[in-house]
Design a protein with these regions (language model features):
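Positively charged n-region of N-terminal signal peptides that target proteins for export
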Residues: 1-4
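Long, low-hydrophobicity, acidic/polar, solvent-exposed interaction domains
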Residues: 18-236
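C-terminal motif of bacterial Sec signal peptides marking the signal peptidase cleavage site
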Residues: 13-16
Protein backbone atom coordinates (compact mmCIF):
# COMPACT_ATOMS: atom_id res chain seq x y z
CA UNK A 1 0.00 0.00 0.00
CA UNK A 2 1.10 3.56 -0.64
CA UNK A 3 1.73 5.65 2.41
CA UNK A 4 2.01 9.42 2.79
CA UNK A 5 4.40 10.56 5.47
CA UNK A 6 6.60 13.24 3.96
CA UNK A 7 8.00 16.63 4.79
CA UNK A 8 6.27 19.82 3.77
CA UNK A 9 9.06 20.79 1.38
CA UNK A 10 8.81 17.49 -0.44
CA UNK A 11 5.05 17.80 -0.68
CA UNK A 12 5.26 21.29 -2.15
CA UNK A 13 7.47 19.89 -4.87
CA UNK A 14 4.82 17.27 -5.59
CA UNK A 15 1.96 19.77 -5.73
CA UNK A 16 3.69 22.29 -7.96
CA UNK A 17 4.19 22.39 -11.68
CA UNK A 18 5.16 24.99 -14.24
CA UNK A 19 1.76 26.65 -14.45
CA UNK A 20 -0.12 25.56 -11.35
CA UNK A 21 0.48 25.06 -7.67
CA UNK A 22 -1.61 24.52 -4.57
CA UNK A 23 -1.05 26.84 -1.62
CA UNK A 24 -2.06 24.66 1.31
CA UNK A 25 -3.75 25.96 4.48
CA UNK A 26 -1.55 26.20 7.57
CA UNK A 27 -2.19 25.26 11.19
CA UNK A 28 -0.10 24.82 14.33
CA UNK A 29 -0.92 21.18 15.07
CA UNK A 30 -1.10 17.86 13.21
CA UNK A 31 -4.38 15.96 13.45
CA UNK A 32 -2.99 13.08 11.32
CA UNK A 33 0.49 12.72 9.86
CA UNK A 34 0.21 9.72 7.56
CA UNK A 35 -2.35 7.90 5.47
CA UNK A 36 -2.17 4.68 3.47
CA UNK A 37 -3.62 3.58 0.14
CA UNK A 38 -4.61 7.03 -1.09
CA UNK A 39 -5.78 8.91 -4.17
CA UNK A 40 -4.91 12.62 -4.46
CA UNK A 41 -7.48 15.20 -5.54
CA UNK A 42 -6.35 18.74 -6.34
CA UNK A 43 -8.31 21.98 -6.42
CA UNK A 44 -6.27 24.76 -7.99
CA UNK A 45 -6.87 28.46 -7.60
CA UNK A 46 -7.64 30.41 -10.78
CA UNK A 47 -9.49 33.32 -9.21
CA UNK A 48 -11.94 33.84 -6.37
CA UNK A 49 -14.83 32.45 -8.39
CA UNK A 50 -13.23 29.62 -10.36
CA UNK A 51 -11.73 26.36 -9.12
CA UNK A 52 -9.84 23.95 -11.36
CA UNK A 53 -10.43 20.42 -10.06
CA UNK A 54 -8.05 17.60 -10.94
CA UNK A 55 -9.82 14.40 -9.92
CA UNK A 56 -8.46 12.02 -12.53
CA UNK A 57 -6.77 9.88 -9.90
CA UNK A 58 -9.80 9.50 -7.61
CA UNK A 59 -10.16 5.73 -7.14
CA UNK A 60 -13.23 4.93 -5.06
CA UNK A 61 -11.63 2.00 -3.22
CA UNK A 62 -8.88 4.20 -1.73
CA UNK A 63 -8.64 6.95 0.86
CA UNK A 64 -9.01 10.36 -0.79
CA UNK A 65 -6.62 13.20 0.03
CA UNK A 66 -8.08 16.60 -0.89
CA UNK A 67 -5.31 19.12 -1.65
CA UNK A 68 -7.20 22.42 -1.86
CA UNK A 69 -5.75 25.88 -2.38
CA UNK A 70 -6.24 27.99 0.74
CA UNK A 71 -7.24 31.08 -1.27
CA UNK A 72 -10.39 29.53 -2.70
CA UNK A 73 -13.69 30.67 -1.12
CA UNK A 74 -16.00 28.07 0.36
CA UNK A 75 -18.76 29.02 -2.06
CA UNK A 76 -16.80 27.45 -4.94
CA UNK A 77 -15.02 24.67 -3.00
CA UNK A 78 -17.87 23.05 -1.06
CA UNK A 79 -20.10 22.22 -4.08
CA UNK A 80 -17.12 20.44 -5.68
CA UNK A 81 -16.46 18.50 -2.47
CA UNK A 82 -20.12 17.51 -2.24
CA UNK A 83 -20.08 16.16 -5.80
CA UNK A 84 -17.01 14.07 -5.04
CA UNK A 85 -18.52 12.80 -1.78
CA UNK A 86 -21.61 11.72 -3.72
CA UNK A 87 -19.50 10.02 -6.38
CA UNK A 88 -17.57 7.99 -3.82
CA UNK A 89 -20.60 7.12 -1.68
CA UNK A 90 -22.51 5.83 -4.69
CA UNK A 91 -19.68 3.98 -6.39
CA UNK A 92 -20.26 0.26 -6.90
CA UNK A 93 -16.59 -0.31 -6.05
CA UNK A 94 -16.35 1.66 -2.81
CA UNK A 95 -14.34 0.17 0.04
CA UNK A 96 -15.63 -0.14 3.59
CA UNK A 97 -13.61 2.04 5.94
CA UNK A 98 -12.05 4.28 3.28
CA UNK A 99 -11.79 7.87 4.50
CA UNK A 100 -11.57 11.39 3.09
CA UNK A 101 -9.07 13.90 4.46
CA UNK A 102 -8.01 17.49 3.81
CA UNK A 103 -4.27 18.12 3.60
CA UNK A 104 -2.63 21.13 5.23
CA UNK A 105 0.78 22.29 6.40
CA UNK A 106 1.75 22.03 10.06
CA UNK A 107 3.71 25.26 10.47
CA UNK A 108 5.20 24.15 13.79
CA UNK A 109 6.21 20.59 12.94
CA UNK A 110 7.08 21.57 9.34
CA UNK A 111 5.26 18.53 8.03
CA UNK A 112 2.26 17.64 5.91
CA UNK A 113 -0.82 16.90 8.01
CA UNK A 114 -4.36 15.68 7.41
CA UNK A 115 -7.82 16.47 8.77
CA UNK A 116 -10.47 13.73 8.33
CA UNK A 117 -13.94 14.78 7.14
CA UNK A 118 -15.44 11.49 5.97
CA UNK A 119 -18.67 11.85 7.95
CA UNK A 120 -19.28 15.55 7.27
CA UNK A 121 -22.61 16.33 5.59
CA UNK A 122 -22.74 19.81 4.12
CA UNK A 123 -25.85 21.96 4.06
CA UNK A 124 -25.48 25.07 1.94
CA UNK A 125 -26.89 28.56 1.41
CA UNK A 126 -30.31 28.56 3.13
CA UNK A 127 -29.51 26.45 6.18
CA UNK A 128 -28.13 27.44 9.59
CA UNK A 129 -27.81 25.21 12.64
CA UNK A 130 -30.00 27.39 14.86
CA UNK A 131 -32.98 26.76 12.58
CA UNK A 132 -32.01 23.14 11.91
CA UNK A 133 -31.96 22.32 15.64
CA UNK A 134 -35.36 23.95 16.09
CA UNK A 135 -36.83 21.88 13.25
CA UNK A 136 -35.38 18.72 14.78
CA UNK A 137 -35.94 19.64 18.42
CA UNK A 138 -36.94 16.17 19.56
CA UNK A 139 -33.70 14.61 18.28
CA UNK A 140 -31.52 17.22 19.97
CA UNK A 141 -33.43 17.48 23.25
CA UNK A 142 -31.12 15.00 25.08
CA UNK A 143 -28.06 17.21 24.41
CA UNK A 144 -26.61 20.61 25.17
CA UNK A 145 -26.42 22.32 21.78
CA UNK A 146 -24.13 25.20 20.86
CA UNK A 147 -24.43 27.02 17.54
CA UNK A 148 -20.89 28.12 16.65
CA UNK A 149 -20.71 30.62 13.81
CA UNK A 150 -17.71 31.88 11.84
CA UNK A 151 -18.94 34.97 9.99
CA UNK A 152 -17.62 36.61 6.84
CA UNK A 153 -15.02 38.54 8.88
CA UNK A 154 -13.92 35.21 10.43
CA UNK A 155 -15.16 36.33 13.83
CA UNK A 156 -16.87 33.89 16.18
CA UNK A 157 -20.24 33.85 17.88
CA UNK A 158 -21.66 31.12 20.12
CA UNK A 159 -25.46 31.12 20.23
CA UNK A 160 -25.34 34.68 18.90
CA UNK A 161 -22.87 35.96 21.49
CA UNK A 162 -19.49 37.33 20.45
CA UNK A 163 -16.50 35.40 21.74
CA UNK A 164 -12.80 35.95 21.18
CA UNK A 165 -10.99 33.21 19.27
CA UNK A 166 -8.51 32.77 22.12
CA UNK A 167 -11.36 32.19 24.59
CA UNK A 168 -13.49 29.72 22.62
CA UNK A 169 -11.83 26.45 23.67
CA UNK A 170 -11.77 27.32 27.38
CA UNK A 171 -15.36 28.60 27.26
CA UNK A 172 -16.74 25.35 25.83
CA UNK A 173 -14.54 23.13 28.01
CA UNK A 174 -15.51 24.99 31.17
CA UNK A 175 -19.19 24.58 30.34
CA UNK A 176 -18.80 20.84 29.74
CA UNK A 177 -16.71 20.35 32.88
CA UNK A 178 -19.13 22.17 35.19
CA UNK A 179 -22.29 20.62 33.76
CA UNK A 180 -23.15 17.53 35.78
CA UNK A 181 -26.48 16.53 34.27
CA UNK A 182 -24.93 13.77 32.14
CA UNK A 183 -25.80 15.40 28.82
CA UNK A 184 -23.27 15.47 26.00
CA UNK A 185 -22.48 18.88 24.48
CA UNK A 186 -22.80 19.04 20.69
CA UNK A 187 -21.12 21.80 18.67
CA UNK A 188 -22.95 22.77 15.47
CA UNK A 189 -20.64 24.53 13.01
CA UNK A 190 -21.63 27.32 10.64
CA UNK A 191 -19.38 29.05 8.11
CA UNK A 192 -20.12 32.07 5.95
CA UNK A 193 -19.58 30.91 2.38
CA UNK A 194 -17.30 33.90 1.68
CA UNK A 195 -14.63 32.55 4.03
CA UNK A 196 -11.55 31.11 2.35
CA UNK A 197 -10.71 27.44 2.54
CA UNK A 198 -7.62 28.36 4.56
CA UNK A 199 -9.77 30.08 7.19
CA UNK A 200 -12.16 27.14 7.16
CA UNK A 201 -9.39 24.63 7.94
CA UNK A 202 -7.97 26.77 10.75
CA UNK A 203 -11.43 27.07 12.28
CA UNK A 204 -12.10 23.34 11.91
CA UNK A 205 -8.86 22.49 13.68
CA UNK A 206 -9.66 24.96 16.46
CA UNK A 207 -12.93 23.09 17.03
CA UNK A 208 -11.24 19.69 16.68
CA UNK A 209 -9.23 20.51 19.82
CA UNK A 210 -12.52 20.35 21.76
CA UNK A 211 -13.51 16.82 20.77
CA UNK A 212 -13.80 14.61 23.88
CA UNK A 213 -16.10 12.18 25.66
CA UNK A 214 -18.15 15.16 26.87
CA UNK A 215 -18.05 17.26 23.70
CA UNK A 216 -19.01 16.09 20.22
CA UNK A 217 -18.90 17.88 16.89
CA UNK A 218 -21.99 17.53 14.73
CA UNK A 219 -21.46 15.84 11.38
CA UNK A 220 -23.69 18.48 9.78
CA UNK A 221 -21.88 21.63 8.65
CA UNK A 222 -23.69 24.71 7.44
CA UNK A 223 -22.07 26.78 4.68
CA UNK A 224 -24.53 29.63 4.53
CA UNK A 225 -25.37 32.64 2.41
CA UNK A 226 -26.42 35.33 4.88
CA UNK A 227 -28.75 36.85 2.27
CA UNK A 228 -30.68 33.60 1.88
CA UNK A 229 -31.23 32.79 5.56
CA UNK A 230 -34.66 33.30 7.14
CA UNK A 231 -35.09 36.61 8.93
CA UNK A 232 -35.03 35.66 12.60
CA UNK A 233 -34.53 39.20 13.94
CA UNK A 234 -31.61 37.79 15.90
CA UNK A 235 -27.82 37.72 15.86
CA UNK A 236 -26.42 34.60 14.24
Amino acid sequence: MKKISITLVAFLLLTSCKKEDVQLPKADISVMTDITDHSPIYMFYENDSVVDVNKNNSISTTNWVFNIDKRLPLQVVIPEIMQLQYKKANSSHKKEGAINVFSYADSIGKNLAFLPFTDVQYKIDKDFSKFFIKKNAEAYMPYHNFTVNFNNENKITVDGNDIEREELVDFIKDFADFTNDGKTTILHLNFDKRLTFGEYIQNKILIWKLNSDKIQISSFEFIYDVNELPDCNCKL
